[in-house]
Structures are given as structure tokens and as C-alpha cells.
């Protein structure tokens, strides 16, 4: 389960992307979460997914 606090979500998602997943799509598939839900939550605090960096920046 991913945290509901957006700052914690950012930290956890970026850590998982860095350490365990080659893409946001792979993370979402494995954790059975919506990519749109994560990207919308993090967009709300000014972050967007960068495919080149495989991180939210």
C-alpha cells in the first residue's frame, strides 16, 4: 500500500523506481495501482514523471 501523504508518496515512489522498477508502468502493474492516480497526486505538488530519469521531478 502506498502512503496517502503526497510528500511520503513522492519519496516512496521515487525510491521504488530507483531501486526496483525500470518504469512507472512496471511499478503500477506490480503494485496494482493506477498510474493516473499517482501522477495526479504528485502533479498536485508540482512533480511530473520523467521517463528519461525514471523519477518524479
What is each residue range found by the language model?
Residues 1-23:
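N-terminal acidic leader/helix
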Residues 27-28:
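Short alpha-helical "recognition helix" segments of helix-turn-helix
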Residues 32-57:
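Short, charge-rich amphipathic interface segments used for partner binding and complex assembly
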Amino acid at each position: 500500500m502506498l502512503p496517502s501523504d503526497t510528500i511520503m508518496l513522492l519519496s516512496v515512489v521515487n525510491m521504488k523506481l530507483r531501486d526496483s522498477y525500470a518504469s512507472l508502468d512496471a511499478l503500477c502493474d506490480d503494485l496494482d495501482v493506477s498510474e493516473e492516480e499517482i501522477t495526479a497526486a504528485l502533479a498536485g505538488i508540482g512533480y511530473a514523471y520523467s521517463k528519461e530519469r525514471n523519477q518524479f521531478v
